[in-house]
Regions:
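Short helix-capping/hinge motifs at transmembrane helix termini and TM-loop junctions
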Residues: 33-34, 65, 90, 116
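Membrane-proximal cytoplasmic C-terminal regulatory module of class A 7TM GPCRs
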Residues: 114-129
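Structural signal for the C-terminal ends of transmembrane alpha-helices
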Residues: 60-65, 110-116
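"…centered on the first transmembrane helix and the immediately adjacent amphipathic helix/loop
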Residues: 1-58, 75
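Interfacial helix-loop-helix junctions of multi-pass membrane proteins
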Residues: 40-46, 79-103
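Alpha-helical transmembrane segments that form the membrane-embedded catalytic/substrate-binding core
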Residues: 52-53, 93-115
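Central hydrophobic cores of alpha-helical transmembrane segments
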Residues: 70-79
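Membrane-helix interface segments
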Residues: 14-15, 64-71, 94-95
Length: 129
């Protein structure tokens, strides 16, 4: 169990790529699945956008810091594209959803960067023993 958690927190490149692909599919299905009618739900879905895009960005940056710019750009384009397409699938395109996604992207980026540094430092310390 602990090694699986470690693998998620400090993913290698291959596992990070798999996670990013899965999260991308989940975000696309969750945000672009056509609804039979528009739903007016109380509350805020901004937290969902924030968390989804933080989770999307984190693994690739935690696996390889050089991929940070690419995954941030990918997340921004994905978020913008979703908000543009949503009105065509009986959803609401909302700039505030995009802003929440952007904040999530940057949180995922900085969290991934910290995890990458910690993992790299841990490997350097164990290799020198």
């Amino acid at each position: 169990m602990f090694t699986f958690i470690q693998k998620i927190i400090f993913p290698n490149y291959k596992f990070a790529l798999i996670l990013t692909f899965i999260f991308t599919l989940l975000i696309l299905v969750g945000t672009l699945s056509p609804l039979p009618q528009k739903i007016y739900a109380p509350g805020s879905d901004k937290w969902h956008h924030f968390i989804a895009f933080a989770v999307l960005t984190y693994p690739m940056v935690a696996a390889n810091k050089r991929l940070g710019f690419a995954i941030v750009l990918f997340g921004l384009c994905l978020g913008a594209g979703i908000e543009i397409i949503q009105p065509y699938v009986n959803r609401f395109g909302n700039f505030n959803d995009f802003k929440a996604g952007c904040i999530g992207i940057f949180l995922g980026y900085f969290s991934g960067k910290l995890a990458y540094r910690k993992n790299k430092r841990h490997h350097l310390m164990t290799a020198s023993r």
